[in-house]
Amino acid sequence: MTNEERSNFTGKLGFVLAAAGSAVGLGNIWRFPYLAAKYGGGIFLLVYILLALTFGFTLMAAEIAIGRKTGLSAVEAFRALDKRYGFIGYLAAAVPVIILPYYSVIGGWVMKYMWAFMSGDAKNTVNDNYFTGFISGTAQPITWFFLFIGITAVVVLCGVEKGVENVSKVMMPILVVLSVVIAVYSVTAPGAFDGVKYYLLPDFSKFSATTVLAAMGQLFYSMSLAMGIMITYGSYMKKDVNLESSVKQIEIFDTGIAFLAGLMIIPAVFAFSGGSPESLGKGPSLMFVTMPKVFESMPGGTVIGAAFFILVLFAALTSSISLMETVVSIACDKFKLGRTPSCIVVLAASILIGLPSSLGYGVWGGVKIIGMQFLDFFDFISNSIMMPIVAFLTCIFVGYIIKPKAIIDEIESSAPFKRKKLFEVVIKYIAPIFIVLILISSVLDAFGIFKI
């Protein structure tokens, strides 16, 4: 796909909504509230925002600028800037190839629960064995996995403007509205105020270096960094779009949805689950075990639960679309394939790679890799190992190989870059140290040596 043939977002709004859709995913909803509650409430929020304005801003701006400067996806972009460092692009490209299949498996779980709440089966979801019974099956997990990844493929097949951009323009506003409505309902419920205080009031007794580390890790994984996604979306960005302000708006979306997720979940858990912080949990247990019980206990819970899982589905879909679009873009650039054959190949490969994750809690449940289920292993390799390595190499590449000026000049081609001094300091000195700490803590966390 040459630069002349390359698709583009129609303007700034389309780019921001698509990139924000990529950044807003399951991690915003099932991990951020848990970490905020665990690590000091308001203190965690403050640390997270400060890191977003510095560390997150710098990494995202660098990736988008690399994409726009070269007009290429991750594999070819690094090669175009310096042939010796093309391997960074290959590492970045491997991340969405690994993540898309298992993420789509989880997306299928979300669709299953959304259907349960919309079809009158919500009361059964509160049973302790409902979730384990579902994921340990064969036909149902595979069916919902196929449906989710099929919808993703159809959107990507439609192209950047008619598919990715148009879907983002519909889903993101609905996602924001649903988040606000559910958050308002949650915080105004009887008994919810204790949860609001627990979430928002600073608790200095829980503040430590681990608070910063947890906020750093959450921000890093939440913003779709080091996956080639922002490079790909940057390559679709028009040259006259203000890159710096676009990044700020993406961060506002991402942080805002994460904040609202906390207001949706924590007060509701306090109000309808006996007010116990221990009830929170994170990940699938929060989403698929705790929340159905919360909805069952609240007035109008079936409707609120359906709205909640629609919201979560939209968050999952906008992220999976960006993952598949990135892999398809790489196939187009690297192998000179058209969009349709690229989509077919990526879909087929993702289904094959995703099947072990879909069946890993059932018929293949006895198979473990370094003591992990298939889905957990793929998550560990991509999130805990490859993403920090790719981000570290990107910082070194920008900071010391092509130099920050190359990126600053690209950003300033559309508007003055107000934070260029901050960008240079963070990309060269601060971000590499942060990323090494994230890598170490992620590996230790995965093996239960140091829990975050």
What are the residue ranges of the model-derived segments?
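C-terminal membrane-solvent junction of multi-pass transporters and transport-like membrane proteins
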Residues: 91, 137, 335-347, 379-435
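Helix-loop-helix connectors at the membrane interface of multi-pass transporters/channels
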Residues: 2, 107-136, 236-240, 245, ...
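Loop-to-transmembrane helix boundary motifs in multi-pass membrane proteins
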Residues: 8, 13-15, 22, 141-143, ...
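Transmembrane helix-boundary motif of multi-pass solute transporters/channels
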Residues: 11-51, 245-248, 252-255, 286, ...
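Inter-helical loop and helix-membrane interface segments of multi-pass membrane transporters/permeases
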Residues: 3-6, 34-39, 69-91, 104-163, ...
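Extracellular loop-to-transmembrane helix junctions
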Residues: 7, 36-62, 88, 140, ...
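Membrane-embedded translocation segments of transport machinery
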Residues: 2-5, 9, 13, 165, ...
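Membrane-interface "cap" regions at the ends of multi-pass membrane proteins
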Residues: 1-30, 59-64, 68-80, 84-87, ...
